[in-house]
Amino acid sequence: MRLARRSSQHGIALIIVMISIFVLTMLAAGFAYSMKVETMLARHASNETALQWLGRSGVEYCRWILVLQATCPAEPYDSLNQAWAGGSGGPCSTNGPLAELEQEVHLGQGSFTWKITDLDAKANINTAGEGMLEKALMLMGVDAADMTPIVNSILDWIDPDDQTRIEGTESDYYERQRPPYQAKNGPIDDISELLFIKGVTPYLYWGPASSNSPPNPLLEKLNPFGSRDRTPNYQVGLVDLFTPISSGKININTASAEVLQLIPGVDQIIAEAIVAGRQGEFDPTGLTGPYRTVAEVRRIPEVNMLVQRQIEQFCDVRSRAFRVEINAKIGASSRTFYAIVVRPTPRETQVVNFYWKY
């Protein structure tokens, strides 16, 4: 009996020891994991400032590129075949600083890649009138019965008064929504503001980009307007046609055929002919390649005198507003920065906005 009791006590002691070892092992593993997480957080936190300065350096690099391009006398235009847009480049890119541009720039312990997008390749939503908005909806394939409410709701959102247009929408309607809000009654600052406007659904905003997946539930909550029992198949989205920041003139060297069709008198055939006409290598005679002046569009057989006058009124060959995207990286840490850069004169650029997304 005494031996059995001792054996039982030894067994209990062994179990207690094993449990203690297991608990201590789990505590040690948890502590090691938490220390690893804290170390990673500390490393990322220490890189935050450096990443931001890398992003700002990338923006300055792009400003330098834009000034170099604008001050090149051999290329009095902005086009997609130039180095700033990722193209092979024209005469100014064969030698000099533009010929030595690096897509990935190494700076200190980090690096950044850059991308410049021409905002003047789209129409300005704040200056687009009723006719241009209607033409955009026709191009997208919106039902004729829905055009007037959407167009007038957009114009009511932008205009400074509270007078409701025919089938339009002002604050008295938006204040009854959940959550309630008011009409902007001012210029659109971000193109995504369109999603707050009655009639502008995520499908209408994104176009084909929204057809492969259901819309963001938050966007549908913010914009409950329109039918949800069917998925519209729009040819293009409002985000592809308009921008809130631009000079107000469309660059015929960078605009898509869809954007060019927003110009009065320009149909699909003319727009595609204009796009095709700007292709090819630089030609100092102006017969092929990018348009050096808007008047050179007359070399396109499909463009008659009346259409040329409309193009000269709405278009330019110089761009003055750009969106810069910088991807900064230090070790395993990375951050994407964005900036809106305007170029009022060939030798002057200004950063209107600098931001990043988590």
Give the positions of each predicted feature.
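Compositionally biased linear targeting/interaction segments
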Residues: R2-Y358
